[in-house]
């Protein structure tokens, strides 16, 4: 199967075409540029069966509109900064949180590295004071390592002396080439921004892949 990237632009296709072309060449995927619709509800109509990744330029939208699109799309969204380059894809950064959906970061990092074996996955492990939360982090880390070892992926584990939130801030502020993988947190209301989204808004200086939770991976408990 040949996957597809859908790159959205606001006014002119030149805003995003070069980025989409470079990423498509790197991964061996097709790309398609679409003018972003006025309503977030119309975004799903732009997605095809093979669409695996969406691109948005950070500076093209207000933060409110950017999040409106990110939450309307049911695919991972790579938000690009102005200084994007091919070197960006040489490193995938995974800050490990305690929520179970953090495991999906490992799945996506593994998927991306399979299509671009030259990149390195950096797993950033926080130090949590609460033992229950620390155990949940260790569980997520063990899952990620199991997947990556099975795939013989290149990765390294970096232990931080900070909590998940402080580790995330540090990674978001890092200007060195790399993509930070971040889960899209659940929100109750369109005008409400969960804490990690507020951290992204305040601190992000580099590329971030925002991943929606895949509910098909979870079994509801009754």
Residue ranges and their predicted role:
Residues 141-186:
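Glycine/small-residue-rich hydrophobic helix-like segments
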Residues 34-36, 80, 124-126, 158-162, ...:
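Conserved beta-strand termini and adjacent loop/short-helix elements that scaffold enzyme active sites
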Residues 1-27, 65-73, 84-124, 139-147, ...:
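Short acidic/Ser/Thr-enriched loop-to-helix initiation segments
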Residues 31-46, 160-168:
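A short, well-structured beta->alpha microelement
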Residues 25-35, 120-124, 150-158:
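Short beta-strand elements in bilobed, periplasmic/extracellular small-molecule ligand-binding domains
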Residues 126-130, 186-187:
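A short, flexible beta-alpha/helix-coil linker loop
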Residues 41-85, 172-222:
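Gly/Ser-rich helix-loop-strand patches that form or flank binding pockets
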Residues 129-143:
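GTPase G-domain guanine-specificity segment
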């Amino acid at each position: 199967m040949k996957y597809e990237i859908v790159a959205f632009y606001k006014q002119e296709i030149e805003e995003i075409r070069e980025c989409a072309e470079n990423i498509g060449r790197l991964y061996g995927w097709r790309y398609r540029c679409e003018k972003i619709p006025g309503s977030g509800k119309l975004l799903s109509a732009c997605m095809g069966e093979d669409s695996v990744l969406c691109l948005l330029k950070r500076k093209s939208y207000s933060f409110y509109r950017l999040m409106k699109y990110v939450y309307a799309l049911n695919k991972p969204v790579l938000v690009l900064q102005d200084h994007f380059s091919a070197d960006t894809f040489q490193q995938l950064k995974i800050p490990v949180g305690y929520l179970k959906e953090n495991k999906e970061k490992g799945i996506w990092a593994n998927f991306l590295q399979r299509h671009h074996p030259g990149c390195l996955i950096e797993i950033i492990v926080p130090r949590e004071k609460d033992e229950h939360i620390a155990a949940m982090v260790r569980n997520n880390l063990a899952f990620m390592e199991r997947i990556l070892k099975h795939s013989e992926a290149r990765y390294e584990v970096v232990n931080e002396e900070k909590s998940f939130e402080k580790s995330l801030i540090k990674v978001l502020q890092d200007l060195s080439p790399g993509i930070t993988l971040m889960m899209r947190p659940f929100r109750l209301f369109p005008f409400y921004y969960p804490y990690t989204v507020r951290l992204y808004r305040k601190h992000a200086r580099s590329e971030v892949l925002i991943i929606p939770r895949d509910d098909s991976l979870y079994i509801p408990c009754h």
